[in-house]
Amino acid sequence: MKTNLLRRLLALLLAMVSLFALPVLAEEGEDWEDEDISLEDVETEGDAEDEEIIVSDSEDASIEGLTPLYTTKIKAFVKTGKGINMRLRQDLESDVVTFVKTGEVITIYKVYPSFVLCEYNGYVGYIVRTWIDENMTVLDPENTPPYGVVPSQYVATLTQTSDVHVSPSLDSDVMKIHPAAGCKIAILEFVDGFAKVLYWRSYGYIDASLLTDLVVVSPTLDPEDHDMPIAAFCSFFEYNTGKEGNEGRCKNIAHSADRMSKIMYPGEQMDLNNDVGPWKKANGYYPAPVLINGGSQLGYGGGTCQSSSTLYNTVRQIPGITIVYRKPHGPGCAKYLPMHQDAAVGSSTLNFIFRNDCEFPIRIQAESTGEGTLCIQIFRVYEE
C-alpha cells in the first residue's frame, strides 16, 4: 500500500514538473513580471525599454471635432503605482496635463499605436496604452469598431527591399526592419506618395513607387469583386540578424502561415495549438527563442506567437468571427504590435481559438517570404 502511494505521488510530482516546463512560444523580452516600483518610474523608463515609441504626429492634444469612442479605467501593473500622467503630446517627455489615479475612468477619442487621445475631468491629453484596461465600453457599437481593431484599405507587394520611414518623407529616419522584395504589406492609407503601415507600436511609411499588385480591401462583407479581401493585416519582423535562432524564427513564421491558410466553413473552429501546431520538429518547425520557466532558450516553433497575433488582428476585423479563447503575453503584451493586440500560443494556457460564425465560408490567405513581413488576408468564399 505504501509503495503504491509513493509511486502515485512520484508520478504526480513528475507530471507537475513537466507541466510547468512547457515552452511559451514568445521570443525573449515579450513577457515579464511586475516590478515593485512606482508607476512614474515605469512611464519614463520601462516603456522605453519595452517599446520604441516613434511618433510623427506631435501636435498638442485636442478633441475638437472628434466623437467619443470608448470609456475605460486606468490600470496599474505595479504594486506601488497610484496613477499615470496625462501628456500634452505623444511624447513621454512632453508637458504633464494632469495626473490620473488608478481606477479612474477616461473617455477615449482616438487610438494610436502607442497612445490614446482621451479626456478626464475636463482635461484632454495622451496616455500610453500600457496603462489602460483593454476591457472597455464601446459608446456606439453600431458605428465604432472594437478597441484595437485596425482595418486596412489596401494590400500591395514590394518590388525591392524597402526602407520604412518614420514620416512620409525620404529624408526622414528609417526603422530597423527593411522588408525584402516580394513581401506583402497591408496599407492603412496613402499619405503624400507613401503607404502608411502599422509598424510595431508606431506608424511607418513606405515609398509608394516601390509597390505593385495593389488590391483594395472591401469595406463591406459583400465585396464587389470576389477577389477582394474583406480583411487584411500585416506585421513586421527582423530577419538576417545573425542572432541565434533568428533564421529559425523567420522560417517558423513562414511555415505557420502556410499551415493556417485554409477555408473555414460556418461553425468551423480553428485552434492554433492543435491546427497550426503542435509546435514540433515533426510538423516542420525549427528551433528559435522561446520562453521556458521565465527564461529564454531555443525551442521548436519559436516566433509563431507573431503568426497567431497577426491572425488575431485580421479576424477581429470581421464581425461574424467569434474569439473563443485568447491570452496576451502577460501585462506588457508583445512588442511587435500595439498594446493589447497580441495572442500568445504554445502552452496549455496560452492559445488562440476562434470560430467562423459568418453565414458564409471564409478563406484565410497568410503569406510570408520570411524576410520582414507576415501579411494575412481573409476572403469571402462564394460557393457555386
Task: State what each model feature region is.
Residues N143-T159, V166-K184, L188-D192, W200-R201, ...:
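Well-ordered beta-sheet/strand-loop patches within structured domains
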Residues T98-T130, P179, C183-S209:
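SH3/SH3-like beta-barrel superfamily modules
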Residues K2-L10:
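Bacterial N-terminal signal peptides that target proteins for export
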Residues R129-T137, A208-V217:
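Structured surface patches comprising rigid loops and adjacent beta-strands/short helices at the edges
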Residues F20-E33:
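Sec-dependent signal peptide cleavage junction
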Residues L14-L19:
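Hydrophobic core
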